[in-house]
């Protein structure tokens, strides 16, 4: 049930809690509970407010030009900010956003200017189940950006999940992973899982976040050898409003420092009734 809090702001119930859309001029921010989840500028669909999305955009833009076609699977939908931005900046791209919360997906489709399918298709379902059931080689990009109460569900972080992601990608496909780090969240586990499956793994992270000095986002990118130009990505990252740097594979290996990867059996996936 939707509950308006002002002429433009709106609050509503979801399958897993509550959500709020707050407007500031042309910009709308989606909150899930008290956590900012997505931000969209209705006057500029390419606008990306969150730094980690800018980092992912720099990687994708290094591989595909404005007129190039690619297919992207977004595991974690919310307001589909990244899918919408890429749909605008790369007009031939096609996107499937997987959102586990049906009511949230319905409200987002109603209140945000999300392009219709086939440009952006919203699929309701569990991200891992969708990965497990997707035909091999179906996507050029997979973005994992799924959170519940501020943490990524463990069944999306295991070696087996990464194996499914790699199988779902084309041979030169790219897996982009938004990892929380700090406090109880340990992005080293995510990176360790990626390193067991992909030949090339790098990351983009604030040094303070990497040291555990504050909670934040680590963007990991994984692919086959020779797919990405690390120097080109690094140059693009340094031009951002808040410049960033890429952590190269050898430095990332030291950062992980023997952290073990999670496995399905450890996290109880699949559950007995699945």
What is each residue range found by the language model?
Residues 35-39, 147-150, 175:
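A short, flexible beta-alpha/helix-coil linker loop
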Residues 159-229:
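C-terminal substrate-binding/active-site "lid" region of AdoMet-derived donor-dependent transferases
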Residues 92-94, 117-119, 172, 198-200, ...:
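A generic structural signal for alpha->beta connector loops
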